[in-house]
Amino acid sequence: MHALVMQHPCITAVLPSARSPEELDATGRQALASCDAIALALPAEAAIHWATALIELGVPRILDLSDARRRDPEVHYGIPELFGAPSAEARYVANPGCYPTATLLSLRPLLERGLIERESIAVLGTSGASGAGKGLADRLHFCNLAGNSFPYKVGEHRHVPEIEHHLGAPISFVTQLLPIVRGMLVTSFVRPKVEPAALLAGLREHYATHPYVTTLDQPDEGLGLGHVVGSHQALLAVGPVARSGLVPVFASIDNLMRGAASQALHNLNLWLGLDAGLGLPPPLARAPLGVPPAFATLLSTNSATNSELSHD
């Protein structure tokens, strides 16, 4: 998020040097207290500790990228296309996780419209190594992951309660690591109440006014991770009915951008009353086609093309 903020036309970063609130000197406390908003990219326990101190300092807006309060009914949950902008009076916004973002973008509109059954939802989430965190683990060593792929945290993934809470339905959820750095493809198997074309139409209707979500005609035309890595874009698609009666619904995102940093900035823009796309890579002008070169999308934070500097 720091790289995005540093190129934002309307936001100035304040970065006091302290590992805990107790280490802040008077200058650091004053600098934080003067901020319009503070983003916390910390583990949950540390985020709670810092948030408490920041509230005492009178910081008006706290954007938390941890999972500390993502299920708190008093906290705005920040997927703008699903839950809108934070209210001007809100003091706390919970930025969603990467797997929840992809899963909810693809399934929540279908459930809200009554197009799929609430039971028997099975989700396979595949992600690059960065999606498994920064902790030391054998599975993340290059010699173990390169040219390899395997499931992890089966039956105990911490994002399941978050997904079920905001989806309003139980799910079966399995995650699998890919031998890549970033990028996430989530495939959900659902039991439809209507034909797949109606599912696709439901997604298109919901996201018609949201340029950072693109619904594809076919899942095998443009769904590759190379189309989303380095971007804020989410790509969605619906497959045909299988012989089992289930339909696959797909979502691909960059787990480090839409699943974390760029979504945080999207929320912050809306919260501050700025243009939603300021500081973000521009949305796709059209749906991508075909298989992209591996990770051809380059990180770009030049937002002039989509904001036209509307606040100048």
Residue ranges and their predicted role:
Residues 66, 189, 254:
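Anionic group-transfer/hydrolysis microenvironments
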